[in-house]
């Protein structure tokens, strides 16, 4: 709101659509935001994405069944994009799922599809595969997420997390690291939805505003620009 966001209704959320400046129309705002993210750095509030915590000794097998791609060889600390289909073969939802531990995953879904995906997964567990040892918990509103993208995103992350090496060897694409910011636990995922070098920072929801302000402060020398989903 403080950054003059225009919102759209998505599922149960109001999500920043674009940020207008100086009487811009939507097209002009989107062009400015896109150019900033391409030339230097942009920041997106990705908190509205659905998040489902998946635990249990059969969690990997469960993912193998609900996604079109395989999950058995995904290493701990890695992320993978997954595509979920309906029983008629049509796309139902998609998102990135992260392997936190041997029997622990964090699935992300589309904002509007989060409740329906959770319901479908619970239905599968209760009616189709009751023998599987899997527990699902909706954690969408437990975490706030700031996504920083652009050619200067790595420099901004380095200012926020000076103890982490953000080179490709130590922090490759589609991986995550646990970290602390201001003494608060958080999780950094190197995931890109823009085609640019990007990182997502997940933190307990009550610290979301503080995280955003820290990111904006760290990125001010790089003209970090809030951008919406449009």
Which residues does each PLM region occupy?
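Glycine/proline-enriched, intrinsically flexible loops and inter-domain linkers
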Residues: 1-230
């Amino acid at each position: 709101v403080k950054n003059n966001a225009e919102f759209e209704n998505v599922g149960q959320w109001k999500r920043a659509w674009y940020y207008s400046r100086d009487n811009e129309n939507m097209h002009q705002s989107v062009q400015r935001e896109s150019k900033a993210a391409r030339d230097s750095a942009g920041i997106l509030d990705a908190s509205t994405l659905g998040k489902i915590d998946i635990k249990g000794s059969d969690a990997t097998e469960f993912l193998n069944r609900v996604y079109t791609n395989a999950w058995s060889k995904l290493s701990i600390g890695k992320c993978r994009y997954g595509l979920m289909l309906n029983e008629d073969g049509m796309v139902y939802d998609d998102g990135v799922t992260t392997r936190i531990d041997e029997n622990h995953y964090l699935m992300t879904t589309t904002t509007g599809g989060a409740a329906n995906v959770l319901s479908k997964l619970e239905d599968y567990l209760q009616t189709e595969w009751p023998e599987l040892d899997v527990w699902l918990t909706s954690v969408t509103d437990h975490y706030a997420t700031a996504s920083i993208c652009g050619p200067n995103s790595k420099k901004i992350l380095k200012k926020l997390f000076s103890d982490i090496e953000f080179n490709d060897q130590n922090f490759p694409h589609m991986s995550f690291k646990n970290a602390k910011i201001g003494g608060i636990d958080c999780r950094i995922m190197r995931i890109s939805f823009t085609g640019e070098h990007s990182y997502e920072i997940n933190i307990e929801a009550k610290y979301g505003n503080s995280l955003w302000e820290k990111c904006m402060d760290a990125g001010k020398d790089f003209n970090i620009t809030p951008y919406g989903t449009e």
